[in-house]
Amino acid sequence: METIIESRQRINSPGVLPPPLSPLIVDVTPKERASISNVANILLKAFGHYEHPDFISALHLNAFQLLPERIAGILSRFGTDFSRHQYGALVFRGLTEVDQEALGPTPPSWKETDYSKLVKYGFICSLLHGAIPSKPVQYYAQRKGGGLLHAVIPDEKMSHTQTGSGSRTDLFVHTEDAFLFNQADFLSFLFLRNEEQVPSTLYSIRSHGDTNAIMAELFKPIYKCPKDANYADDENAGEEVTTSILYGNRERPFIRFDAAEQIYNEKAGQTPEAMHNLVRFWDEAKQLIYNDFVPDSGDLIFVNNHLCAHGRNSFVAGYRNENGQLVKCERRLMLRMMSKTSLINIQSVTQLNDPYFIMEEHYGKLFHSQQ
């Protein structure tokens, strides 16, 4: 008779299950959705803002006590699962209702965002991170901080850039802030609007299966990554630090990767060996990109930033396709939150009096003048 241990070994043995090629999609029930909305309203009355110190300090307790049990359980397991079968992303379909009238028109860019209209959504996103458990943080490298919640809006002035404000070119898959050693551990993307019906793209290092010869070359610390298009060219100059693309366990690696900046940016300055390895890897990775999910209003994508890269297809902001005709609509609006599982490990790169504010500029270098 087969023992439990033998059964588990058989199930987990190589070749039994194929590598994951898509995220787990969780359909949130009407009861769960109503519960989450009610909880957010209660927290809004109690604390006023999702950045209130008393709320943030008790975030994990609030998350496990207040979120629907199924949702909290899914996130808690997700936070500790780095296995061969873990894709590294979750989709919560229909997480929350969005009052489009109360939201008002989408502003021209993130700079004009009225965050007073988004406080409830900030509570919802932070609770999800709290259930990992992980702590929302902000980065000086991203909008000089800008708070724990960022509105991501297509900006016509940046439409051709490889940033969240772009639209007219595909945003290549990337792990968030691949030019930092202390990049976010987890990301959430809450879609308030996506009337243009833009697919979100995801790519998981787990989709390759076991580490192959091409991937093994990416453990070498020979790769450069400039800061992204949010920075001027002179701010990107002279970045000579090199690091690996893959790190951690060699059989179940993590990834730090930005195709746009490390491969397509001519100023990256990769060595011939590094570029050769990157191009070979990218040829494989491109075949594994998932872009079958088109977010609707109220959907949320939750990502392990060490396992899964994200991006989006190109689109014409403010227009949707109806029977082959472009029809004007409200421009897309998404909310991003980032978090770290430990504040202890990042204290050397945070503001002295704010352990949630990360001051890393590029691979360990700090924005010293802003401390």
From Swiss-Prot:
Q: Which domain of life is it from?
A: Bacteria
Q: Where does Fe cation bind?
A: 174, 176, 310
GO molecular function, one example? 2-oxoglutarate-dependent dioxygenase activity
Uppermost EC category: oxidoreductase
| Gene3D superfamilies noted in UniProt | Clavaminate synthase-like
What does the UniProt cofactor note say? Binds 1 Fe(2+) ion per subunit.
Kindly give the InterPro entries that the UniProt entry links to this protein.
TauD-like_sf
Q: Which cofactor does it need?
A: Fe(2+)
Iron listed as a keyword: yes
Q: What is its EC number?
A: 1.14.11.-
User: Keyword set for this entry?
Assistant: Dioxygenase, Iron, Metal-binding, Oxidoreductase
Q: Which reaction does it catalyse?
A: L-lysine + 2-oxoglutarate + O2 = (4R)-4-hydroxy-L-lysine + succinate + CO2
Please report which protein family the annotation says this sequence is part of.
Belongs to the clavaminate synthase family.
The function of this protein is: Alpha-ketoglutarate-dependent dioxygenase that in vitro catalyzes the regio- and stereoselective hydroxylation of L-lysine, leading to (4R)-4-hydroxy-L-lysine.
Q: What is this protein called?
A: L-lysine 4-hydroxylase
